[in-house]
Amino acid sequence: MHQKISLIVQPGDSFFPIVRAIDRADRAINLTVFRMDDPIIQRALIEARQRGVRIRVLISSSARGWEERNHKLLKEATEAGIATREPAGDSKRARYHYKMMTVDDREAFVFTFNPTRENLHYARDFGIEIFSPAIAGEINRLFAADWHNRPFTADHASPLLVSPLNSRQKMTDLLQNATSSIQIADARLQDPAIVALLVKKARSGIPVRVLGDEQQGSTLPAEIAFRAVARYRLHAKCTIIDGSTAVIGSMNLRTESLDRRRELSITVDDTAILQQLNAVFESDWERRAPRSDNVTTQILRAFPPSCPEAAESATPGFVLISRNNALLRHAINNGMTTIGRAEENDVVISDPLVSRYHARVALDVGICTLTDLDSGNGSFVNGERITGEKWLRPGDVLRFSESEEFRLLEV
């Protein structure tokens, strides 16, 4: 059914899978937005439009607390030549909450996360990237129906769960057929019928484990094993059945999401994906970090074991990651990190418009600041030129003169 499928795990994978897909688009991109403030993804979309890619974006008008920001996003995207619409049926009672992107009718993404700096760097979230004309076509069919405000008939044979059309029935069937285990990551597990079914399965001897937030634990029946995710804010919506099938997407297991909102999830049974998901679930359940090739691991590998910098990098810190090359990562250590064209800088940018000693980053007790060193062409944070010292936070986008962009990440 598909040529290739990949799992996106946040925090960790950041914007890279999304930007790579946007950058290789030739003809068309369809995207739904509930919330979005990531400047790298926004810039990639604008650049794709400038090279002739047809882009359509459905932007929610009912995202709580984001109404003004989404209106501004819609206006800016329209000015950039991107076709935008607000779903005609979007309302506070029946929000269009689904999170998807298709590229060139061959590649599709289904996300649990919004492309915001918070979701990309501070929340436990997942996404599925799949190369499948059939699945991309079915998602595009849904998108077109919502774009034109037309009825949609879901294909029950598809691996997609579409609310409010067939998600409840498909999810109920999957849970009912569980034989060995049910694992759920969902901070809004509230639907009475789903909870009752989970209790029934638990009483039949099938372990049911739920990862959620602290407030949720007191509301679930005792038959359901519960733990709160301590390390991140849990925003994922993921159900793993018998360790071999997973449902990932925008849909919480609550009545609004199942029966009223527009939601989209996908069923996955790929062995490698399930191994990754099970490992992440166990690490969050046990409150320990999984073994992975994350940013910290890659920085440590850049040093020989005997090198003293390796021990220093093992402690929490920051890195600058290049947008153009995800493997180009500059560690920001305690003290001063200098940036410029001269070879003696800690971060060397070979761009003639970058000053020899352009800027410096200071890290002191977890507080990170950027200072422009009276450069000729300026230092920029999230597109705005800075003067003097600027406090930084993870997720900020840094640019020096007209150089490539760097994202600041915490590790």
Regions found by a protein language model. Give the residues of each.
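HKD-type phospholipase D/PLD-like phosphodiesterase module
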Residues: 1-26, 32-176, 191-245, 249-273, ...
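Short, surface-exposed secondary-structure edge patches
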Residues: 99, 237, 351, 387-390
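A general beta-strand register signal
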Residues: 102, 109, 240, 247, ...
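Structural motif
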Residues: 103-104, 241-242, 333, 355, ...
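Intrinsically disordered, low-complexity acidic Ser/Thr-rich regulatory segments
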Residues: 297-352, 362, 397, 402, ...
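Short alpha-helix capping/helix-loop boundary micro-motifs
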Residues: 15, 168, 346-347, 382-387
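Buried hydrophobic-core signal for structured, non-transmembrane domains
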Residues: 29, 359-361
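C-terminal boundary/linker segments immediately following FHA domains
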Residues: 363, 369-371, 376, 380-411
